[in-house]
């Protein structure tokens, strides 16, 4: 199978400051990839290089087997087949929604029967058929998002690129537009690259996630693999919350840390030092011990919240704060037991 997108060893600097460093990625036909990372990590620059708005210093980019950038090739933007929705606004404010989508078809402008059929199909696909005669100033932000996607899909691009497409919308509208946009992309069989800083969004909607930090890709994997089998401590901390401790491995599949001796998931040899990570949801709090890994603790303070109970407790010399969706009624100062569900993760050499 020919990759919908292939990026090989791509690098880019601005004024001798590296922004992208040896980026390699591939995307299968119909696959949705989320690129996530903190602000300034290089994810938007990577998207601009893919779209042809920035020229990489080195590396190569190919689209469905066709090289569009390499040492000897640099196709103009007009000769590539990317769709890049200008999210949040229509590109031509004096044209109706219908004409804005027709604008995406290029020279045809929706004059032929085939072009009109394509425009009507995109209106229906994105749920805006009833808005066809309206003008941009008559649309809400969410409606303009749908128009932007319909216009980008109209010329049938091989790949859709989206840079923080939902960031300007309120939470309720963002959720609805996001689900509709993902559904439209999948219904149209399009590959897509989303740039996002929202890890929950990526975990829910991506086929694969690429985590970036300081111009490098730390790991590319499915959401499940990235969450359960992370290859890098920085990646796992960005993709989800974690409680970390310095630790040393033992020969029996455990590690010693400030919470005591805990089971770990690691293939490193005994004696290796590194960082142990526990997901907060692995903990549960009970009044008594049970035949599982138990850590004795003292409850310092419990604070009921809307959807969980915030509990501060001391385990040995360590003070932990956990947000537990359900917890027994415990008085401050009472002794309790933390149960650990499953092994902790261990990252050799990542000392705190």
Curated annotation (Swiss-Prot):
Entries under Pfam families matching the protein: ABC_tran, FbpC-like_RD, FbpC_C_terminal
Function recorded in the entry: Part of the ABC transporter complex FbpABC involved in Fe(3+) ions import. Responsible for energy coupling to the transport system.
Ranges where the ABC transporter domain occurs: 5-239
EC number: 7.2.2.7
SMART domains linked to this entry: AAA (SM00382)
PANTHER family (UniProt xref): PUTRESCINE TRANSPORT ATP-BINDING PROTEIN POTG, SPERMIDINE/PUTRESCINE IMPORT ATP-BINDING PROTEIN POTA
Positions with a binding annotation for ATP: 37-44
Subunit structure: The complex is composed of two ATP-binding proteins (FbpC), two transmembrane proteins (FbpB) and a solute-binding protein (FbpA).
Organism: Neisseria gonorrhoeae
Predominant subcellular localization, coarse grouping: membrane
Subcellular location(s) per record: Cell inner membrane
Entry GO MF terms: ABC-type ferric iron transporter activity; ATP binding; ATP hydrolysis activity
Family recorded in the similarity comment: Belongs to the ABC transporter superfamily. Fe(3+) ion importer (TC 3.A.1.10) family.
Gene name in the database record: fbpC
Membrane topology, as annotated: Peripheral membrane protein
Protein name: Fe(3+) ions import ATP-binding protein FbpC
Keywords, sorted A to Z: ATP-binding, Cell inner membrane, Cell membrane, Ion transport, Iron, Iron transport, Membrane, Nucleotide-binding, Translocase, Transport
